Structures are given as C-alpha cells and as structure tokens.
Amino acid sequence: MRISTTWLRDYLKLDIPADELAEKIERTAVEVDGVIRPSEGLKKVVVGHVLTCEPHPDSDHLHVCQVDVGESEPLQIVCGAPNVAAGEKVIVALPNSWIGGHTKIKKSKMRGVPSNGMLCALDELGFDEKLVPKEVADGIFILPDDATPGDPVFSYLGMDDEIIDMSVTPNRGDMLSMNGTAHELAAIYDQQPTMPKVDLYEDATTVAADDLHVAVAADEHDVPMYKMRLIKNVTIKPSPLWLQIRIWNAGMRPINNVVDATNYILMQYGQPLHAFDFDQLNDGQINVRLAKAGEHLTTLDGEDRELLTSDLLICSGDQPICLAGTMGGLATEVTDQTTTIALEGAVFDAVKIRKTAHNHDLHSEASMRYERGIDHGMTATALDAAAAMIAELGDGQVASGMVIGRDEDVQPTTVTIDLARINHVLGTELSLDTVSDIFKRLDFPTVVANETFTVTVPSRRWDIHIPADLIEEIARLYGYDNLPATLPTGQPTIGKLNETQQVIRDSRKLMESAGLTQAISYSLTTETKSKAFALHASDVTKLDFPMSSERTTLRLSLVSGLLDDLAYNNARKEHNVALYEEGRVFYSQPEQVRPKEIEHIAGAITGSMVPKSWGVAEQPVDFFQIKGIVAGYLKSLALQDAVSYVATAEHPEMHPGRTADIYVGDQLVGFVGEVHPTTAKAYKIRETYVFELDLTALIALPKARQQYQPISKFPSITRDVAMLIDDDVTNATVVALINKKGGAHLRHVQLFDVYNGSHVPAGKKSLAYTLTYQDQNATLVDDDVTTAFEKVLTALTDELGAEIR
C-alpha cells in the first residue's frame, strides 16, 4: 500500500519528515518497505512552452521545436513524439540535466540539426510503464495550460511527493486505505483526523430502481451486502491531472474519469467498487450467483477464463459479466461510448475471493482488500462518494435512490476488559486515565466502571474481537519500548525429555551407528506418492491452495520421500546410499476434522554397504542386511512381546517375494523388503531395500524389564545341529522352538548355514545352527548339556518333521 504524504496531509496536520513517519508506522503498526521520492536523482527538468514546431528537413517523423523554458532565449529542441505541437506546455530536460535511468542529457545534433535538450515522456522521468496513461504512452506528456515555463516540473506531476510504501499484514486490512492510515496516525500523534465529506446530489426526475434491477441468489454468507447506484448522461474523458497524480502515486494507471474515480475511492475508503456500462446489461438486470460448470468469462485483461463452480459471479440475465470481487468482464467495460454507469458496491466473503484469485491467478487491488477484510459499515458511504465523483467529473446525474440487492445490519463489536488484566499481561502499572486516553486516541468509544472498560470497536477495526486485541492496541500506542523489562518469577525447573522425545533421539543415534545418514523430506507430496507404501489404509489430506502440483497432499509414508532422495543422489552418480528419516505421517478418516499425526521411522539402502577396496570384496546390499538393521533397532527398544516377520504380497510397491510385515505380538508395526522393480524403475533408482516402522505404536507397546546381569566367569559349551526341513518352515520358527526346549542354560542360537542345492530333496532345505550353553554360577557338566541338547533334537523331529543330519 503506497501512502502519499501529500494526500495524508488532507486528513492530518503533520509537519513531520516522511522518514520519521515511516519509522513511527513501522514501530507501531505495520512494516514499511521504504520511502519513495519520485524526483530523486532528477535535475534541471522544467516546464517548457512550445512556441513553434516545424518538420525536420531530413526526417519524416522528427520535429524542430523552439521552446520557451523561462530563459532569455528559447531553446531549439528536436523531438520525435507524434503529439508535439505548437502551443503545448511540455516537460523539458535542459542540457546537462539528469533524467530517469541515471541518463544525462547533453547538447547534440539530430540529422544535422542542433538540439539543446529533450522533450520528455513520463517513462523517461522514471515512471513505470504500467502507470503511464495509454493516451500518452507513445508520446510526450502534455502539461496543463497554467504551467509556468521554467518552473521545475515536479510539482505539476506530483513528483515532489514523498510516498510511504507499507507492507500491510493480513490482520491490518484497515490500513489498505487512506482513511484507515489516517486514523492510525491520528492515534499515534494524538490528533483528530479530518474525514472526507460526501456531497451527493440526486436527480429527482429519475429513479434508479426503475431501470436497474438486482437479485442476489448467492448465499448470504458469501454475499452479505450488495448495493448499486445509477449515474446517467456521463461523458467519458481523461481524468483531471490532480486525480491522475493521486492514482499513479498510489501505484495504478489512470484510465478515464469513471475508472479513476472508483480507484480513488478504493484508495480512500478501502472499498472495492466496479463500474458497468449500463447499456451493455440485459434489460438492466444484475444477478449475483455461483458459476456453473463449463461457463466462461472474458475478463478485462482479455483472458478467456473457464469458471469454477466455487466462483462468485455478477451476471446480467444469465450471462456472466464479472468475477465478483476480482475483475470485471470485457463485455461491460466502460468505454468512450459509455453514457450510463451502473456502479457496484458490495461485501463478498474473503475465503471465496481468495479461492477465485488463486484459482485464476488473478490478484487485483480489489481482491487483496476483500481477502483481508473491508469495513462493512462504510460500503454505502463509499458507493455514494464514488457516484458523486463520477457525476462531477463526467457531467452526469445520479439517479435517485440506491438499488439494494441485499443489506447487512452492521453492529459494532463490544469488548470488556479490566485494568488489572491489562497491567498483568503488559507488566505495567498504567492508570485508568492513561488507558482511557489511549482508547480516546484510537477513537474507540469507552465506558469505564469499577476499573473495567467496556469498549465499542468501530466497524473499521474488524480485527478486534477479544480482550487480547485491546491489550495489543494499548501496548502499541503506549509504546513497546516503554514496557518494563520483567525478570521471570517462580522456582526454576530442570527440563526433561518425555518418552517419545527420548526414543526419537535414541533412534537417530542407532540409525547413524548402523551406517545410515539422516534425510529430511517434504511432508507434502503428490497424491499418488502420498498413498504409496502406506502401512495402514487411510484417506489423504489435500491442501486447498498448494504452492505447486508436486506439493498437494500430506504424506502417509516416509519411504516415498526417501526414494526421491535416492533418485536425486543416483542422478548425480552417487550409487552407494543409505538413508533414514524420522518424521510424521498424516492419517485421516472421513469423520476427522484434521489428520492424525503419527511418528514413523524409515530407511532405504541401495548399492553397496561395503564398497570394493584393496583386500575387501564389494558387498551389495540385500534383504538380510536391512532386516538386520531393523532387528537390531527393535532389540534396542526392549519390547516385551516377540518380534516376528511374516512374508507378504500386500504392498504393491514392494517385491512380493522379498517383503515381510513386522509384528510385535499380534500388532502390525511396519514392513521391510525390496522395492518392486517396477517402482524402482519409475523412480529411476537401482535395486533398493527399505523399511518403515510405526514409531508411535512401538513407543506405546509394553517394554520388558531390563536387569543388569554380569558376564559369566565360567566357560560355555557349544553344540552344532544340521537338519533337513520343509522349505516353508522359517528360521524364526526353528529358533523359537530351540529356545523353548533348550533348557535353563541355553544362552544363544545362531544360524550359520542354509543350503538347498544338490543332494537336498525338492521342497526341503538344510539349516545348521550353533547352540551355546553357559551357567552363571558353575562350570557346566557335559552330561547336562547333552541331555538338554537331545531334548531339542527330539522336539525338532517331532514338532517340525526335521531330519537330523
């Protein structure tokens, strides 16, 4: 929001430098990006009067002009502008002057004719091309007839103004207007602002409602207020220079007297308005409704836009003519032939307008204000002010009466707060009089009783609803620098990690000790990637306004992000990569308002865990390596129930023959295995193994009691056993049976060989184990070990059908 200090002085008596004003605004209200001085860097640019204008003897487009610049003799200047003519007052850059772009003007010759200066267009003075009126876009700017030759040109163009460029935060939409900013500065400097008065004269011979008919079909929440005025016999012409100056200093291009009037009122009141060419309406009909599927509208920028069913439309009959609160349609644009204006003033829902502006990538001055909120109590006043201004500038008449499609009973907000609460929050000892004075400066009517303030908040401050908002206003006006510094009171406490935080921290250490590097992936991904590798069935959570098509949906799994990271590394010739990530996934059910956040931990390895080196053979990653990492990690959690791995083909993104679900007791807590070759190809990665665990579930599971046990001082005894067993019997089943039958002194069971080649019958495999026995208190007797070992052999034969070899 650009605030002209010249315009601001219409409201307040401020003999204060712009830099000081900007600093005060920034310290008290909103951020300031800087102070703009349009004439900065320009020198010796004056008003000129073209006395004569003759064709150049050696050019078909140049002119040789004699120009009075207030000196004893006129200057001869060669100019190529098509609109230069004798008698015009123009902008002259004298010899040795500086103009826009740090350009120095010198005496020169143009095709043999001396030229002692330059006749300037606005963009040559540094004006943004987007702000230059179209009628002078290809020529020089013509100054008013009363401009005095030789005077510096800056005051005639508003370039002597100082403009404060504010970055208005979403909660302070009231400062997107001159009125709102004036109220803010009046409170800061303890002044009473002079607000503009509206002098509207209606033509009693015409009634607006006789010609203009408005129907609002949209929901009252979407369109709480919709009003119109009718202005007849309007002449469309360029705006007077004072208005053009105010418009371009506000950062907008002057168009014509009607459009400029609506933009002027927009800047003054913060109320978006829209002017329709009444003669282009269908029998004077205005209908406000939601768009239908498949409808199109060509907007003022010439773009044909396919409308969405969430878009609010202004229609004439059933024909869309305007995207409500965003941009008008080309069909009802005000042109030089327009004579009757249908003027709209309305309140539209902020969310609706924000969605429309985002969906169509169409952000305008109007949509920005609707998104941040507008003063509902000022809509009718702004509409009247614009109608009066259009009638004055266009020599028209305002038809009597306002046509109301829908009205809103705007009631001020009342907030109650007591002095003790204010001082408690701010750490101050403010008096009743001090706080009352601040509310008076804010122009908030206040009733005080028993040290309690009942504050009536004007409709222009729609951001204030609760006591905390009033405390913020008091702090701002009192001055943040004046608030006392208060040391914390109370007994200090020592912080401690909770169980989840401690497990997460330990998990990271364990993964890194296993050779994995931490990765942090985006929580947002595509809908397809979000659903991939999900441990449990869930709805997805999608953003209403994603920043890109690649970041639309909250993830259900960490693995997809890790595979993206692997692909990134593989594309850069890094093929031996081992990553892990600890983070949240987001599960959602239809009845939930927001998704449930669950801590997961996942890993992915590809290439070789041990690269080829001198004396060391390369060891490509395989299922057993990643399963070993998972097993070691789960062991560190000291879970009470047994961990089991069950082969599965339920994960379509995983290899069906090399994937296992992980259970603790009967609860599914994760999976481990090889990524399906098709999935790996889609990600452009090599053979890859992954795991993912539900960390929240693991933390909640019961833990085994951990007790210290000293290392035995007595020797151990080992026994080896080899067996033929059915191919579908798992190692876990065999180990569980051996542990069950092995006796009190069995300490460890280790699988050391698997064979199913030649000499092994079909459907069978050979497994070999080492069993370690040890007593904590005495040296084991060989007979005791033999007895226990034979019980194991018997159990293997009887219960698993094993053939001992």
Curated annotation (Swiss-Prot):
Cofactor(s) of this protein: Mg(2+)
Record has Cytoplasm as a keyword: yes
Name of this chain's protein: Phenylalanine--tRNA ligase beta subunit
Main location: cytoplasm
GO biological process, one term: phenylalanyl-tRNA aminoacylation
Residue ranges of domain tRNA-binding in the record: 39-154
MF terms (GO), sorted A to Z: ATP binding; catalytic activity, acting on a protein; magnesium ion binding; phenylalanine-tRNA ligase activity; transferase activity; tRNA binding
Organism this protein belongs to: Lactiplantibacillus plantarum (strain ATCC BAA-793 / NCIMB 8826 / WCFS1) (Lactobacillus plantarum)
Subunit structure: Tetramer of two alpha and two beta subunits.
EC class: ligase
Positions annotated to bind Mg(2+): 463, 469, 472-473
Annotated signal peptide: none
Cofactor, how bound (note): Binds 2 magnesium ions per tetramer.
Enzyme nomenclature, EC number: 6.1.1.20
Catalytic activity: tRNA(Phe) + L-phenylalanine + ATP = L-phenylalanyl-tRNA(Phe) + AMP + diphosphate + H(+)
Keywords annotated in UniProt: Aminoacyl-tRNA synthetase, ATP-binding, Cytoplasm, Ligase, Magnesium, Metal-binding, Nucleotide-binding, Protein biosynthesis, RNA-binding, tRNA-binding
Similarity field: Belongs to the phenylalanyl-tRNA synthetase beta subunit family. Type 1 subfamily.
Annotated ranges, domain B5: 410-485
Compartment annotation: Cytoplasm
Occurrences of domain FDX-ACB (ranges): 712-805
